[in-house]
Regions:
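The canonical Cys-X-X-Cys-His
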Residues: 45, 52-62, 143, 147
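Electrostatic cytochrome c docking/interface patches
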Residues: 20-50
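Electron-transfer interface patches adjacent to heme c in soluble/periplasmic c-type cytochromes
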Residues: 72-115, 128-140
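Inter-heme linker and motif-flanking segments adjacent to c-type heme-binding CXXCH motifs
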Residues: 1-5, 38-40, 64-68, 113-115, ...
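Extended, well-folded interaction surfaces typified by the phenylalanyl-tRNA synthetase beta subunit core
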Residues: 2-22
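A cross-kingdom marker for long, charged
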Residues: 122-159
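Stable alpha-helical elements in mature extracytoplasmic
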Residues: 41-44, 54, 101, 105, ...
């Protein structure tokens, strides 16, 4: 069991009144709207990845003001939550998961096991063990469907 950490943002990021201007510049309010050109499973997977599992928060780089760079969606993040590189999960030829089958992605998300029989480490191990392992089978299939269909983008490696 992990104890919750106290909020520890440095000044000026700890100043709550700055949220207003940030939200004006970067926040897009609204509800998830399914894409009509995609399957029901893809839409469910998109909702899980972007709204529930927050995959974008680690796997997409950040731009000005710390907002996610939507043009580099899931293309990797040079400065992840632990300070290290978070891999590109699009099907681009230079991406970490480029040769994975859908079954490989499903096993990894559910158990943390990689195709080479190694296991996820760091933050992703926690995500798998404490979150994704509890998805229903249909939600797991939907998430895999969405990830496998991501737009291929070259990896973002520069800080």
């Amino acid at each position: 069991e992990q104890k919750n950490l106290e909020h520890d943002l440095a000044v000026p990021f700890s100043w709550r009144w700055l949220n207003g201007p940030w939200k004006l510049m970067f926040f897009e309010p609204g509800v998830y709207s399914p894409r009509q050109d995609k399957s029901e499973a893809w839409n469910r997977g998109a909702y899980i990845a972007t709204a529930l599992a927050h995959c974008t928060e680690c796997h997409s780089p950040r731009g000005l003001g710390g907002a996610t760079d939507t043009g580099r969606f899931m293309a990797g993040n040079p400065v992840g939550p632990d300070g290290g590189y978070v891999p590109n999960i699009t099907p681009h030829p230079d991406a970490w998961m480029r040769d994975w089958e859908k079954a490989d992605i499903a096993v990894y998300l559910e158990t943390g096991e990689l195709p080479d029989s190694d296991y996820a480490g760091g933050a992703m191990a926690e995500v798998s063990d404490n979150g994704l392992a509890f998805l229903t089978q249909s939600d797991l299939v939907a998430l895999v469907e969405f990830i496998a269909a991501l737009k291929p983008l070259p990896s973002t490696r520069d800080r």
